[in-house]
Amino acid sequence: MRYTSAAIESLIEEFAKLPGIGRKTAQRLAMHILHQHTDEVEKFASALIDVKQKVIHCRVCQNVTDIGADPCAICCAKGRDRSVICVVETPSDVLAFEKTGQYRGLYHVLHGVISPLDGIGPDDIGVKELLSRLSPDDGPRVSELIMALNPTVEGETTVLYISKLLKPLGVQVTKIARGIPVGAELEFVDEATLSRALEGRSAL
């Protein structure tokens, strides 16, 4: 059953394009928006536009940051161990590790994994940017790279590719420990499990 309002149907269709949102949920969201005050809806619309216009990738770690805050707050933070880089798939994974309060190194966000079936190769993710960080002109040398990608076939493929690429550079490459279910996404793993996986990492 479709609404008689084309505007409502259009909004439902847009909400339904979001991951994990079916038509019923999209309908509820559209009805919620319809009954909100105009100023609240305008704030919501403004926030959506700001995300596209003001958010960029940090030029160092490729994590998300705002225009005018590049490098990002983590890359600029004092007290971080700059000899260790944790390689993750998405910005959400950075948040997951930060919530543990255990990791004090830096990060590198790939924004994807190697997936030949989807036409995604090494040049389509942040591998080139990662390599450029391992031979800095100044500052401390990176001694360890922690591979913390989701335990999927594509994630494992990416881990193997990067570890082989870095072997000649003399950088120790480690991988977070098992204990995270195969196919799970790191952003949904609880802090205690993630901390244990980080502490129990092993060399590749």
Swiss-Prot record:
<comment type="similarity">
    <text>Belongs to the RecR family.</text>
</comment>
<dbReference type="GO" id="GO:0006281">
    <property type="term" value="P:DNA repair"/>
</dbReference>
<keyword id="KW-0863">Zinc-finger</keyword>
<dbReference type="InterPro" id="IPR034137">
    <property type="entry name" value="TOPRIM_RecR"/>
</dbReference>
<keyword id="KW-0227">DNA damage</keyword>
<dbReference type="GO" id="GO:0006310">
    <property type="term" value="P:DNA recombination"/>
</dbReference>
<feature type="domain" description="Toprim">
    <location>
        <begin position="83"/>
        <end position="181"/>
    </location>
</feature>
<dbReference type="Pfam" id="PF13662">
    <property type="entry name" value="Toprim_4"/>
</dbReference>
<keyword id="KW-0233">DNA recombination</keyword>
<feature type="zinc finger region" description="C4-type">
    <location>
        <begin position="58"/>
        <end position="75"/>
    </location>
</feature>
<dbReference type="InterPro" id="IPR000093">
    <property type="entry name" value="DNA_Rcmb_RecR"/>
</dbReference>
<dbReference type="InterPro" id="IPR023627">
    <property type="entry name" value="Rcmb_RecR"/>
</dbReference>
<dbReference type="GO" id="GO:0003677">
    <property type="term" value="F:DNA binding"/>
</dbReference>
<dbReference type="Pfam" id="PF21175">
    <property type="entry name" value="RecR_C"/>
</dbReference>
<keyword id="KW-0479">Metal-binding</keyword>
<protein>
    <recommendedName>
        <fullName>Recombination protein RecR</fullName>
    </recommendedName>
</protein>
<keyword id="KW-0234">DNA repair</keyword>
<dbReference type="Pfam" id="PF21176">
    <property type="entry name" value="RecR_HhH"/>
</dbReference>
<dbReference type="InterPro" id="IPR006171">
    <property type="entry name" value="TOPRIM_dom"/>
</dbReference>
<dbReference type="GO" id="GO:0008270">
    <property type="term" value="F:zinc ion binding"/>
</dbReference>
<comment type="function">
    <text>May play a role in DNA repair. It seems to be involved in an RecBC-independent recombinational process of DNA repair. It may act with RecF and RecO.</text>
</comment>
<keyword id="KW-0862">Zinc</keyword>
